[in-house]
């Protein structure tokens, strides 16, 4: 058993009552006081909160997942019903209690919208006048929200219209606002004007990280205001009305900066963190090259968010294919390095000019990022790597050109349509000339008796024995086609991807931040050079398809359905699908065996979203269990060992971007780890959440919870709270293992003619060294065994008599869902 700061991983039975204990929680900005039996007030006796959860919600503790040998978890029949972790949230936030707001930090496949709808049902059943305002991205309206409302929204017995959810009485209380709309703020205020504000209001914000990122952008740039207007209204409502409830939903609560979390928690519990990013970072972030949550302030961060986070891992790891992650570093060819250096110097000049003007170029490292993927070969004086068409020569705006390169849907002003057409023709000419150049080399190779197909077959035959990677093969001695060398000269990455795809035992997913030119466009050329083609005309197992903004939406749906079809499990119709940023959300790919991430991105969350497109819950169920393995290749090119004399930058742009993303990810992960530890349900759900990683759940020391005056979880004033150091991760906290034994024990509940009346004997865990007794199921401290003459007092030889030292409030019953 683990013991923390003199508090344990053991916990008591819910039959220990404290009938006279009344808890009062004052709501910020409201003079009324919420009085309720059986609850803990975080600002009064909040140190009891972690063990109060265990006592009152032990029925929601998740059991260990045990699979039978050779049992396929994806073929286990699962009944369509709310899971324990979903029911817990409804009971924890029940309208008769003082807790009103939460962040549902629940992973993929957890049924987050169903959890939110369950809360709607509970609140509606308690007060059918409750207002529900659901803030979502427009793309989420039909799927999942309307679909899940149809499935999960409760019905009164008198309601007969089973299929049409929009006619349900309780649906009339639900108001949707699309926070990504250009009119989001006015739409939101229009909804507010229609409501009866004397009734309770619940705000539900789905994909809350996107909404908060918009708020952060409004605050930081001082340009927009849509999200900020909504955010400030909700916060004001929360401050002034005790009946206001907020549910934030996110599997990835922060994207770019931990201050996004401060904005979230200040919405849930106004004023809990500094409203200035500078002040927040000074308090909670270390000053170092690789900053993290300050270990000296981690305890305070966790105490201040107690009660605000529910964490559930989502679909458990056994439902996913196994991932084999491989970071691939490929040295630039001499030719690629020469062209890269030209663009590196050009970018430095652009940045310097922008600095002098007091602006920042939107093209930050764009040229070298593209050159890391591919540089055009020297075909002739007009078509070569150095003269690659650039939007500036066509007077095309940087933003439009960047969106165009990423394959986004463009709403082009008439003034720029003709310019864009000229730019597009110049690009097409470059691509056509480049492909002809490569094909001519291929013809000469055929005449010489050694083609790239020979190289591919040799690589396939020797992979796993003579060669463990493409680079090892490329650098080995032996005959090679000229095309192989030239393709490497222009793009080590794309050549490696083509070779690994050739030997893949199944379907392949390729992602690039770029569609035009140095992304999917050129990747298709590389594939055609090794015998692949568009799936509509390709031979079996040699087809590719595309899924990005330049493909018509209807065609995208058809392509996805074809690729995922049961007749294409191994890729006989289409082996390769190529994705762009527009596919980071909303697409699920089945039976993927290889994923190739062509370049790093500024935020690790983007890459994880991409990886998740091909590794979803039971996305490999059509494959035998032994084949449910996905090799994930993450590429970057590095500069050659010998740099130019005037090159003082050792890192390539690929390396720089990855380094920035990792630093940002480590910082955010340090905060997310603290949130997992402080989650209200940490102990309840740990059998699932800790299947793939282990950590300690936040609790206060036993010495703190056995006092008569227990004390608050945190001090409201953060300056005072800094000194209030207690619990997991506090300065003097320790984690140690203790030895316990199973015993029967009783405690006195009354007297009869001066004779003690005891409770029924119950199983507990007993620490002989300290005399502490712990709940048998959830391991929280209950009390201590009484000692007489240094011997434990017993009712009989098998039953100990204990003293209740930890007075934990109890709630009874549950709310109607």
UniProtKB/Swiss-Prot annotation:
Transmembrane segments: none
PROSITE patterns linked: HELICASE_ATP_BIND_1, HELICASE_CTER
Protein keywords: ATP-binding, Helicase, Hydrolase, Nucleotide-binding, Virion
EC number assigned by the record: 3.6.4.13
Skewed-composition ranges (Polar residues): 17-29
Residues annotated as binding ATP: 106-113
One GO term describing the cellular component: virion component
Catalytic reactions on record: ATP + H2O = ADP + phosphate + H(+)
SMART domains found in the cross-reference section: DEXDc
Listed GO biological process terms: DNA repair; replication fork processing
Pfam families according to UniProt: Helicase_C, SNF2-rel_dom
Location of the Helicase ATP-binding domain: 93-271
A single GO molecular function term of this UniProt record: ATP hydrolysis activity
Every Helicase C-terminal domain range: 495-661
Motif (DEAH box): 206-209
SUPFAM superfamilies: P-loop containing nucleoside triphosphate hydrolases (SSF52540)
Segments for region (Disordered): 1-29
Cell location: Virion
InterPro entries documented for this protein: Helicase_ATP-bd, Helicase_C-like, P-loop_NTPase, SNF2_N
PANTHER family the record matches: DNA ANNEALING HELICASE AND ENDONUCLEASE ZRANB3 FAMILY MEMBER, SWI_SNF-RELATED MATRIX-ASSOCIATED ACTIN-DEPENDENT REGULATOR OF CHROMATIN SUBFAMILY A-LIKE PROTEIN 1
Protein family according to the UniProt entry: Belongs to the DEAD box helicase family. DEAH subfamily.
Protein name: Putative ATP-dependent RNA helicase R350
Species, as recorded: Acanthamoeba polyphaga mimivirus (APMV)
């Amino acid at each position: 058993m683990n013991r923390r700061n003199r508090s344990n991983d053991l916990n008591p039975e819910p039959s220990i009552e404290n009938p006279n204990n009344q808890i009062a929680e004052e709501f910020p900005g409201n003079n009324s006081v919420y009085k309720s039996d059986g609850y803990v007030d975080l600002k009064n006796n909040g140190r009891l909160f972690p063990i109060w959860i265990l006592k009152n919600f032990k029925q929601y503790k998740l059991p260990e997942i045990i699979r039978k040998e050779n049992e396929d978890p994806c073929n286990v029949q699962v009944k369509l019903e709310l899971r324990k972790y979903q029911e817990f949230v409804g009971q924890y936030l029940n309208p008769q209690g003082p807790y009103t707001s939460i962040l549902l930090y629940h992973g993929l496949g957890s049924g987050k919208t169903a959890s939110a709808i369950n809360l709607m049902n509970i609140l509606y059943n308690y007060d059918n006048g409750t207002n529900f305002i659901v803030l979502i991205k427009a793309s989420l309206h039909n799927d999942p929200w309307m679909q899940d409302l149809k499935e999960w929204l409760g019905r009164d017995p008198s309601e007969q219209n089973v299929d049409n959810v929009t006619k349900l009485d309780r649906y009339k209380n639900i108001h949707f606002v699309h926070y990504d709309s250009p009119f989001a703020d006015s739409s939101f205020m229009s909804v507010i004007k229609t409501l009866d504000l004397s009734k309770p209001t619940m705000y539900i914000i789905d994909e809350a990280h996107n909404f908060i990122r918009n708020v952060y952008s409004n605050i930081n740039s001082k340009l927009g205001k849509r999200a900020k207007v909504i955010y400030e209204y909700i916060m004001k409502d929360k401050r002034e009305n005790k009946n206001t409830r907020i549910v934030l939903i996110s599997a990835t609560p922060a994207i770019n900066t931990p201050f996004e979390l401060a904005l979230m928690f200040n919405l849930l519990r106004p004023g809990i963190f500094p409203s200035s990013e500078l002040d927040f970072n000074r308090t909670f972030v270390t000053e170092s090259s690789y900053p993290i949550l300050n270990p000296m302030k981690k305890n305070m961060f966790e105490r201040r968010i107690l009660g605000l986070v529910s964490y559930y891992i989502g679909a458990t790891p056994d439902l996913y294919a196994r991932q084999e992650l491989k970071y691939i570093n490929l040295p630039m060819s001499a030719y690629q390095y020469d062209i890269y250096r030209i663009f590196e110097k050009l970018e430095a000049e652009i940045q310097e000019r922008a600095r002098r003007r007091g602006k920042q170029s939107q093209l930050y490292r764009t040229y070298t990022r593209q050159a890391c993927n591919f540089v055009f070969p020297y075909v002739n004086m007009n078509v070569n790597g150095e003269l690659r068409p650039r939007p500036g020569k066509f007077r095309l705006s940087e933003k439009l050109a960047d969106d165009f390169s990423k394959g986004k849907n463009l709403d082009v002003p008439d003034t720029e349509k003709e310019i864009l057409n000229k730019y597009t023709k110049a690009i097409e000419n470059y691509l056509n000339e480049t492909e002809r150049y490569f094909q001519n080399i291929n013809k000469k190779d055929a005449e010489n008796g050694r083609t790239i197909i020979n190289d591919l077959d040799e690589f396939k035959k020797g992979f796993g024995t003579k060669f463990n990677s493409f680079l090892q093969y490329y650098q080995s001695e032996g005959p090679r086609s000229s095309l192989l060398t030239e393709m490497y000269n222009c793009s080590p990455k794309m050549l490696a991807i083509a070779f690994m795809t050739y030997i893949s035992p199944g379907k392949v997913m390729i992602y690039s931040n770029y569609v035009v030119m140095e992304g999917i466009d050129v990747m298709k050329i590389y594939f055609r050079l090794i015998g692949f083609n568009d799936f509509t005309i390709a031979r079996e197992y040699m087809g590719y398809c595309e899924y990005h903004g330049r493909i018509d939406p209807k065609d995208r749906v058809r392509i996805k359905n074809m690729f995922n079809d049961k007749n294409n499990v191994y890729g006989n119709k289409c082996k390769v699908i190529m994705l762009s940023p527009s596919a980071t959300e909303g697409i699920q790919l089945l039976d993927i065996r290889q994923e190739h991430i062509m370049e790093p991105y500024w935020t690790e969350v983007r890459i994880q979203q991409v990886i998740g497109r091909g590794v979803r819950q039971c996305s490999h169920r059509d494959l035998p269990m032994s084949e449910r393995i996905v090799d994930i290749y993450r590429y970057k090119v590095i500069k050659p060992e010998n740099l130019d004399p005037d090159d003082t930058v050792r890192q390539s742009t690929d390396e720089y971007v990855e380094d920035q993303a990792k630093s940002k990810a480590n910082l955010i992960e340090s905060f997310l780890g603290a949130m997992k530890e402080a989650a209200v349900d940490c102990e309840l759900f740990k059998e699932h959440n800790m299947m793939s990683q282990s950590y300690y759940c936040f609790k206060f020391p036993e010495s703190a919870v056995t006092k008569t005056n227990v004390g608050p979880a945190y001090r409201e004033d953060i300056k005072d709270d800094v000194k209030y150091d207690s619990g997991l991760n506090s300065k003097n906290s320790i984690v140690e293992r203790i030895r316990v034994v199973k015993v029967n024990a009783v405690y006195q509940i009354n007297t009869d003619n001066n004779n003690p009346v005891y409770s029924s004997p119950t199983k507990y865990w007993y620490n002989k060294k300290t005399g502490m007794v712990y709940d048998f199921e959830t391991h929280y401290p209950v009390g201590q065994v009484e000692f007489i003459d240094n011997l434990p007092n017993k009712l009989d030889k098998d039953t100990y008599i204990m003293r209740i030292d930890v007075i934990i409030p109890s709630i009874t019953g549950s709310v109607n869902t």
